[in-house]
Curated annotation (Swiss-Prot):
Keywords: Autoinducer synthesis, Iron, Lyase, Metal-binding, Quorum sensing
HAMAP family, per the entry: LuxS
GO molecular function: iron ion binding; S-ribosylhomocysteine lyase activity
Protein name: S-ribosylhomocysteine lyase
Species this protein is from: Shewanella frigidimarina (strain NCIMB 400)
Origin superkingdom: Bacteria
UniProt enzyme class: lyase
Length: 169
């Protein structure tokens, strides 16, 4: 099985909250696609609650689009990581890490401003596979944690696993 890019970085050295360019690629027509690792908490140390991350999934995707889309940038998808330490965001374009970080912080402020659980988008049995597994309170706690900590940048060169380590795993 091929080694995926996300497993060539040292998760023990990742800062969080932090933005990392996980991958650059181009479509056959030449459009730039960038995949970002939006690391909310330190791998193997913290984990996002399942209700909190699920509610963030519903809110974060829309709020990030409001703050980041435009000027040659269009978000394709924002999905939670299986390890529940963050999200992957795929988009058309190549925004800077600082622009992504600023948009992320603005989106977290938006999350804290949601007034009621009924204001969570697509919160119904027709549009959500586990519509009862949500917590606005937990999502807002996560958002406040991100705002308080700020968002830094993880550089791939600083996190790259050596061939020796990879060979021994």
């Amino acid at each position: 099985m091929p080694l995926l890019d996300s497993f060539t970085v040292d998760h023990t050295r990742m800062n969080a909250p932090a933005v990392r360019v996980a991958k650059h690629m181009s479509t056959p027509s030449g459009d730039a696609i960038t995949v970002f690792d939006l690391r909310f908490c330190a791998p193997n140390k913290d984990i996002l609650s399942e209700r909190g991350i699920h509610t963030l999934e519903h809110l974060f995707a829309g709020f990030m689009r409001e703050h980041l889309n435009g000027d040659g940038i269009e978000i394709i998808d924002i999905s939670p990581m299986g390890c529940r330490t963050g999200f992957y965001m795929s988009l058309i374009g190549q925004p800077t890490e600082s622009k992504v970080a600023d948009s992320w912080l603005a989106a977290m402020v938006d999350v804290t401003n949601v007034i009621d659980q009924k204001d969570i988008p697509e919160l119904n049995e027709y549009q959500c596979g586990t519509y009862e597994m949500h917590s606005l309170e937990q999502a807002q706690d996560i958002a406040r944690m991100i705002i308080a900590a700020g968002v830094s940048v993880n550089q791939n060169d600083d996190l790259k696993l050596s061939d020796e380590i990879l060979g021994n795993l």
